[in-house]
């Protein structure tokens, strides 16, 4: 045995000072290694739609409904199963409804407690007792453990279980216990959650989604382009901040900014009302959902004025970054100086176009990118709100702690958008700072820049460059989070000709359906073999046009969650999520979610169907997973320690 092995084993012996303790740990770990792997749940592109997100999280993309079917089969009618599922998803709210309609609550409690324990037993069967114990609420831990490990078939045991239920009911704890057991089922059904980008965007509740994630037991995030925009704003990038506010106003979703993070928009509102008092702001009218009755005409007009004000500010701020960084090669996004303020046209490389709006009271034709004193004041005040928002800064910390540009996990490669490629399908070398990087090295370098923007000393050159780069990640042509020739925001507002709105996608989107390309990318990230996959979000799958969520002969899984209602008319569905359990991969297609109220009152679940099933040749065990490989290494080291004890190379220490 080598000396460095002995040095390590000496350290290990401090945790396991006797041969018996080392042997016991080997037995425990080998038992865990032979259990079925835990279930992973993959979501992407939530876009602030918190109600649909929370529902999919609660029903685990139909996994809880499947557990209920497995347990009760034909014993319960479909309506009874729906009622039980609704109770598990929304225990507090469902209990209130039951109390209003059911006078025989004691009988209902007895039946329901029996049903919930059976579902919980099913959800817990793949885990060790120790792991299950850690998921239980402390105040009911002992009693739930007792109930989980009794079968209820033996008459004596059945009477024992009934007596426990009777005690729970008679002491007035039934509601609290039902809530606890329902939430335990939710935790047990999903072992690990992967959010493959874009928590944020136009939806009304990104802050609620982040609050929910921060309470979740195990999760990771692969940053998306909209996440990067918010992260950039939260670390002090004024251009990112202006984009965030503009998008919120464009879709009239101010809840996340105002209610969620306490961002004060009043200074912007006053400025916009004064500056654009006689301006109809027609091209800046917000895009309202058909069912949105929240805003009257006066409110819509004010939002339009604010929308225009922040958009003009954004174009000016973006010029500052473009001027500071010629290496970004984004001069083609500076367009105000191409406007002919005399005849109301703009000259682009593709031609001369009439402008849809020419009322620019804050734009000096001689110096179109200069902020007025009032505009600078608005920027400073808004930036101060973003930097001082305690909740936003806490959510930023969570995004850094649990987030990354990519993740390799159990033979799958997860990233939100793209791996930049050349026309010949090779990995594209992209400049970051003063060097070029491709593939995995590129994503590693990009992540280093993102983290530098958060941890480097304030006002240092290193930090300022990294903060600027976060805006590039939002809209830069070679950004792995964007990967399009340009973002045509200016053209979409001011030019009617839709040909100017086109955003040419990078070669990744052209070639990602090819198996050889996906295998090349997987190999770049250290993954090879038949069971490896790329799991990707970002681009909605247009199911009604025949597009499929699986490509490259099964190597590519596209799981844009389709939570954003804006895309549902073009996709025809509400997107896809993915379940990876011990039996294989299950790609689930969802219909649009109506509302939490309907889910509770009318027991209306999201209609979901499994569209792709990739079943493994054998049931996957913990030992087949990344964590299992680490545990196997621990077993190997413990066996070496046991050998060292038996040969007297290390002396046992009695406690």
UniProtKB/Swiss-Prot annotation:
GO term, biological process aspect, one: gluconeogenesis
Domain of life: Bacteria
Keywords: Carbohydrate metabolism, Hydrolase, Manganese
Matching Pfam families: FBPase_2 (PF06874)
Cofactor(s) annotated in UniProt: Mn(2+)
The protein's annotated pathway: Carbohydrate biosynthesis; gluconeogenesis
Signal peptide bounds: none
Disulfide partners: none
Keyword Hydrolase assigned: yes
Keyword Amino-acid biosynthesis: no
Catalysed reactions, semicolon-separated: beta-D-fructose 1,6-bisphosphate + H2O = beta-D-fructose 6-phosphate + phosphate
Residues in coiled coil: none
Enzyme class: hydrolase
Entry EC number(s): 3.1.3.11
Single GO molecular function: fructose 1,6-bisphosphate 1-phosphatase activity
SUPFAM superfamilies reported for this sequence: Metallo-dependent phosphatases
Family listed: Belongs to the FBPase class 3 family.
Protein name: Fructose-1,6-bisphosphatase class 3
Annotated source species: Porphyromonas gingivalis (strain ATCC BAA-308 / W83)
Lineage: Bacteria, Pseudomonadati, Bacteroidota, Bacteroidia, Bacteroidales
Gene that this polypeptide is encoded by: fbp
């Amino acid at each position: 045995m080598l000396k460095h092995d002995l040095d390590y084993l000496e350290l290990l012996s401090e945790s396991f000072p006797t041969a018996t303790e080392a042997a016991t740990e080997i037995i425990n770990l080998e038992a865990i290694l032979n259990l079925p792997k835990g279930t992973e749940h993959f979501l992407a592109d939530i876009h602030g739609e918190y109600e649909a997100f929370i529902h999919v999280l609660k029903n685990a993309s139909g996994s809880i409904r499947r557990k209920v079917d497995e347990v009760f089969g034909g014993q319960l009618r479909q309506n009874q199963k729906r009622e039980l599922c609704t109770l598990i998803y929304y225990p507090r709210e469902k209990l209130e409804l039951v109390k209003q309609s059911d006078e025989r609550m004691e009988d209902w409690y007895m039946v329901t407690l029996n049903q919930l324990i059976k579902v919980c037993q099913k959800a817990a069967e793949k885990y060790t007792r120790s792991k299950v114990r850690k998921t239980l609420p402390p105040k009911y831990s002992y009693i739930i453990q007792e109930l989980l490990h009794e079968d209820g078939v033996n008459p004596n045991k059945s009477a024992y279980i009934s007596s426990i239920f009777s005690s729970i009911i008679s002491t007035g704890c039934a509601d609290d216990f039902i809530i606890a057991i329902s939430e335990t089922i939710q935790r047990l059904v999903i072992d690990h959650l992967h959010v493959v980008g874009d928590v944020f965007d136009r939806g009304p509740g990104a802050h609620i989604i982040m609050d929910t994630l921060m309470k979740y037991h195990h999760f990771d995030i692969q940053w998306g382009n909209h996440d990067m925009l918010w992260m950039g704003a939260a670390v002090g990038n004024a251009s990112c901040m202006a984009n965030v506010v503009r998008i919120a106003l464009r879709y009239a979703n101010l809840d996340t900014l105002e209610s969620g993070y306490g961002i004060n928009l009043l200074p912007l509102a006053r400025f916009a009302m004064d500056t654009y008092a006689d301006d109809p702001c027609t091209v800046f009218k917000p895009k309202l959902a058909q069912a949105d009755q929240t805003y009257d005409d006066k409110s819509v007009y004010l939002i339009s004025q604010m929308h225009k004000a922040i958009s003009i500010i954004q174009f000016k701020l973006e010029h500052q970054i473009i001027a500071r960084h010629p290496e970004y090669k984004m001069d083609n996004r500076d367009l105000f100086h191409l406007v002919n303020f005399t005849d109301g046209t703009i000259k682009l490389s593709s031609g001369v176009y009439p402008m849809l709006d020419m009322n620019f009271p804050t734009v000096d034709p001689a110096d179109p990118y200069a902020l007025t004193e009032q505009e600078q004041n608005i920027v400073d005040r808004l930036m101060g709100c973003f930097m001082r928002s305690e909740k936003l800064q806490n959510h930023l910390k969570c995004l850094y702690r649990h987030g990354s540009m990519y993740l390799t996990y159990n033979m799958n490669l997860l990233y939100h958008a793209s791996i930049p490629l050349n026309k010949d399908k090779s990995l594209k070398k992209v400049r970051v700072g003063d060097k070029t990087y491709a593939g995995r090295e590129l994503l590693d370098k990009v992540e280093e820049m993102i983290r530098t923007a958060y941890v480097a000393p304030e006002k240092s050159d290193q930090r300022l460059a990294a903060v600027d780069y976060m805006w590039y990640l939002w809209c830069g042509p070679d950004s792995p989070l964007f990967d399009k020739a340009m973002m045509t925001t200016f053209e979409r507002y001011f030019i009617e000709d839709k040909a100017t709105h086109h955003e040419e996608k990078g070669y990744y989107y052209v070639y990602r359906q090819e198996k050889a390309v996906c295998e090349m990318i997987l190999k770049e990230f250290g993954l090879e073999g038949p069971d490896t996959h790329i799991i990707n979000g970002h681009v909605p799958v247009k199911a009604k046009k025949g597009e499929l969520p699986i490509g490259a002969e099964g190597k590519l899984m596209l799981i844009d969650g389709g939570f954003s209602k804006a895309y549902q008319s073009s996709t025809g569905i509400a997107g896809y999520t993915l379940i990876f359990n011990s039996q294989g991969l299950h790609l689930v297609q969802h219909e649009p979610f109506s509302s939490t109220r309907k889910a509770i009152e009318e027991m209306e679940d999201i209609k979901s169907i499994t569209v792709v099933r990739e079943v493994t040749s054998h049931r996957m065990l913990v030992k087949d997973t990344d964590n299992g490989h680490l545990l196997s290494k621990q077993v190997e080291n413990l066996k070496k320690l046991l050998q060292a004890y038996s040969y007297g190379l290390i002396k046992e220490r009695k406690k």
